[in-house]
A protein has these predicted regions:
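A glycine- and charged-residue-rich anion-binding loop/surface
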Residues: 1-300
Length: 300
C-alpha cells in the first residue's frame, strides 16, 4: 500500500519537565523521560509497497500529517497535562463541585476525573452524531464509555446521576464551535441520564458476582478470568467487558478477551444471526438483575 518516509516534530518542554532528573538518565527525543513531547508527525506518501517488498513511485505524492491538537494546547498554555488545559476546565470544575473536593484532593486522585471528563465529552459528540447507547457496533461503544464513566464517578463518591451535568459543561464550551452539540442537547442529556440509571440498576449485582469470580481466581492462583464468564456478566447484568477488565486489572488480574468475543459470537449465531443482540445486556438484563437482587436480599 501507499507509504513513505516520515518525520516527527517534538517540543522541548525544558529540563524541569524531565521526570528522571537526578539519575544517570540522559534526555533524548523518543527517550524514556517526559521532557520531549511529540506534537506532530508527517508521512511523505510517495511509494506503493508490494507484498514482495518492491517499492514503486506513486504517480501522485502527498503529505499525510497528524497533529495532536490537545498536545499543542497544553504546550501553548504551559501545563503538564491535556486535562489541565481549558479544553477540560469547565467539566472538571463541575465534577469537582459535585464531589466537594478541593483542587489538591482532585489532583491527588486525578484518574477518575480524567476518565469521566474524557468519556462524557466523547459520549456527547457520539450522541450528537446520532450514536445512542446500544448493544452492537458503535452503539455498544457509546454504552460502554457512558457506563465506564459512571463507574469511575462512583470512585469519587458520585452515586446519583451526574453525567448530564458534566455534559452540559462540555456543550457550553464546545457548542459555539460544534453547533450540533447545542442542537442535540436534549438528546445528549436524556441519553446520558437514562443510560446511567439503567447501569445503576445492574452494576451492584454484576460487580458483586464479578468479585466472587475474581476471588475464586486468586484462591486458585489463576491470573486470567475466563472470557465466557465475563460474557455471562454482560448478558445477565449488562456489565461491559471493558469494565470487567478494569476491575480485574485493579486487582492484578485480567480477562480473556478472545474467549469473550467467541462467546459473544456464539450467542449471536445461536440467536438467529445476531437478531437478539439488541436486547443483550439491555433492559432484559436489568429486569433479571432486579429479580436476582431482590432474591438475594431475601436470602434465597
Amino acid at each position: 500500500g501507499p507509504c513513505g518516509p516520515c518525520s516527527e516534530i517534538h517540543f522541548d518542554l525544558g529540563e524541569e519537565r524531565d521526570n528522571l532528573r537526578g539519575t544517570d538518565h540522559v534526555c533524548g527525543v523518543n527517550g524514556e523521560c517526559t521532557r520531549y513531547l511529540e506534537l506532530w508527525n508527517n508521512v511523505f506518501i510517495q511509494y506503493n509497497l508490494f507484498d514482495d517488498g518492491r517499492l514503486e513511485p506513486l504517480p501522485q505524492k502527498h503529505v499525510d500529517t497528524g497533529m495532536g491538537f490537545e498536545r499543542i494546547v497544553s504546550v501553548l498554555q504551559g501545563v503538564d497535562s491535556n486535562y489541565k488545559t481549558d479544553l477540560f476546565a469547565g467539566s472538571l470544575e463541575v465534577l469537582r463541585s459535585l464531589t466537594g473536593q478541593s483542587e489538591k484532593e482532585m489532583l491527588d486522585n486525578f484518574t477518575p476525573y480524567r476518565v469521566v471528563c474524557d468519556h462524557v465529552r466523547s459520549a456527547a459528540f457520539l450522541i450528537a452524531d446520532g450514536v445512542v447507547p446500544g448493544n452492537a457496533g458503535r452503539n455498544y461503544v457509546a454504552r460502554m464509555i457512558i457506563r465506564r464513566a459512571a463507574r469511575f464517578g462512583s470512585k469519587i463518591g458520585l452515586n446519583d446521576p451526574f453525567l448530564a451535568k458534566v455534559a452540559q459543561a462540555v456543550i457550553n464550551y464546545y457548542g459555539d464551535f460544534y453547533p450540533e452539540l447545542k442542537k442535540a442537547q436534549p438528546a445528549i442529556l436524556d441519553n446520558l441520564t437514562r443510560e446511567e440509571i439503567r447501569f445503576a440498576r445492574t452494576v451492584e449485582a454484576g460487580t458483586a458476582h464479578l468479585e466472587n469470580l475474581l476471588a475464586d481466581l486468586k484462591s486458585s492462583n489463576s491470573p486470567i478470568l475466563d472470557g465466557g464468564k465475563a460474557f455471562d456478566l454482560y448478558a445477565t447484568y449488562g456489565l461491559p467487558f471493558e469494565i470487567s477488565r478494569d476491575i480485574a486489572r485493579e486487582q492484578g488480574l485480567d480477562v480473556d478477551e478472545i474467549a469473550f468475543n467467541e462467546a459473544k459470537e456464539k450467542h449471536a449465531l445461536a440467536s438467529g444471526g445476531g437478531k437478539a443482540m439488541g436486547k443483550l445486556g439491555g433492559e432484559d438484563a436489568e429486569f433479571f438483575a432486579e429479580i436476582l437482587k431482590d432474591l438475594q436480599g431475601k436470602g434465597k
